[in-house]
Amino acid sequence: MTSASTEPFFNRSLADTDPEIFGAIGKELGRQRHEIELIASENIVSRAVLEAQGSIMTNKYAEGYPGKRYYGGCQYVDIAEELAIERAKKLFGVNFANVQPNSGSQMNQAVFLALLQPGDTFMGLDLNSGGHLTHGSPVNMSGKWFNVVSYGVREGDNLLDMEAVQRKAEETKPKLIIAGGTAYSRIWDWKRFREIADSVGAYLMVDMAHIAGLVAGGQHPSPFPHCHVATTTTHKSLRGPRGGMILTNDEDLAKKFNSAVFPGLQGGPLMHVIAAKAVALGEALQPEFQDYAAQIVKNAKALSETLISGGVDVVSGGTDNHLMLVDLRKKNATGKRAEAALGRAYVTCNKNGIPFDPEKPFVTSGVRLGTPAGTTRGFKEAEFREIGNLIIEVLDGLKVANSDEGNAAVEAAVREKVIKLTDRFPMYGYMG
């Protein structure tokens, strides 16, 4: 094979090599540019993060950890991983960080592998109260391999029932208690959770995947020094690539987590993603990230207040973080219908169960809304109040139509307003 024969492989563009995938990416770029992203677990990464993740680091196998690899030629990917580790430690004020987990589920599985045996008891927030699949859902590995004791929110105010957490912990003596969730809009009392964990001899694990950016930005109390271990994804409010991290101050636990990630669960880490994690963590260490985190919360409060003023119920009466659960029953809508109608109006969100939801999981009585992606675009309170009013327009139109097809006229009118709004806040201009 000559250099002439390999030249196309190394230099042919995606558009020329695979026009179908190129076309799909182009359409997705258009969707992201023109639609308002309100999915609470999504965000928009910087060009620098994209460049790192799309780099030649993807070519390198690097089983093991920096300085202790099972492959040669790792001296430069070691630099990337060491930077990611040091930046994570600095950002969250901890002594140990593992940046290799490929996802949020795998980071949580690694903690289970390190601290639990099959059949052990652990406690986690019930999925219907805002927990995550990996916190003990019966359809998830966590619910199949372990004895799960779920806690939840109180009926009425929809706030965490800490007395019930204490009582269940005393009754069941769990080995691990998980605090944190995916759809709880209030401040977590880490200190109280640690007191409960200590009272029954349990480890306290905090899954701060959703709020890590707020913790880093000073908008939510840090789980340290209260927790034994914290896990977080690197996307969501941290605004990095999709992946996970495990953080702790305990050296013995850190060794267990490292062994659980590799070789316990994973083989070669995704070095291009780890490089991108390092970039995102570096961005989060800049002073402007504090402003970004503060704006996320301001925007969430503005959106929540606008919806409530428009006759829409928000679970627990508001939000202290980046997200809110909207109870649609007063609008005679389901989450499934509302998600579809808002999507047709170029407002993207996800249907979501609400506490004590009478509807099926694929229907739901609510939608979950979040502000991180819109805040990244530059939206402030005024824009989120406008967005709140647009959501109300769609929901009111849906109520009048009372059908899965929605209200085409209202949705078309809102769609035009959304395009005008998003055109004022362009993204990725260099992509053409």
Curated annotation (Swiss-Prot):
It is an enzyme of class 2 (transferase). InterPro entries: PyrdxlP-dep_Trfase, PyrdxlP-dep_Trfase_major, PyrdxlP-dep_Trfase_small, Ser_HO-MeTrfase, Ser_HO-MeTrfase-like, Ser_HO-MeTrfase_PLP_BS, SHMT-like_dom. GO terms for biological process: glycine biosynthetic process from serine; tetrahydrofolate interconversion. The record marks 235 as: Plays an important role in substrate specificity. Pathway: One-carbon metabolism; tetrahydrofolate interconversion; Amino-acid biosynthesis; glycine biosynthesis; glycine from L-serine: step 1/1. The modification N6-(pyridoxal phosphate)lysine is found at residue 236. One of its GO terms (cellular component) is cytosol. Its EC number is 2.1.2.1. Signal peptide: none annotated. (6S)-5,6,7,8-tetrahydrofolate binds at residues 127, 131-133. Keywords: Amino-acid biosynthesis, Cytoplasm, One-carbon metabolism, Pyridoxal phosphate, Transferase. SUPFAM superfamilies: PLP-dependent transferases. Pfam families: SHMT (PF00464). CDD domains: SHMT (cd00378). Its main location: cytoplasm. Gene3D superfamilies: Aspartate Aminotransferase, domain 1, Type I PLP-dependent aspartate aminotransferase-like (Major domain). One of its GO terms (molecular function) is pyridoxal phosphate binding. It is found in: Cytoplasm. Its cofactor is pyridoxal 5'-phosphate. It comes from the Bacteria. It catalyses: (6R)-5,10-methylene-5,6,7,8-tetrahydrofolate + glycine + H2O = (6S)-5,6,7,8-tetrahydrofolate + L-serine. Belongs to the SHMT family. NCBIfam families: PRK00011.1 (NF000586). Catalyzes the reversible interconversion of serine and glycine with tetrahydrofolate (THF) serving as the one-carbon carrier. This reaction serves as the major source of one-carbon groups required for the biosynthesis of purines, thymidylate, methionine, and other important biomolecules. Also exhibits THF-independent aldolase activity toward beta-hydroxyamino acids, producing glycine and aldehydes, via a retro-aldol mechanism. Homodimer. This is Serine hydroxymethyltransferase. The lineage of its organism: Bacteria, Pseudomonadati, Pseudomonadota, Alphaproteobacteria, Hyphomicrobiales.
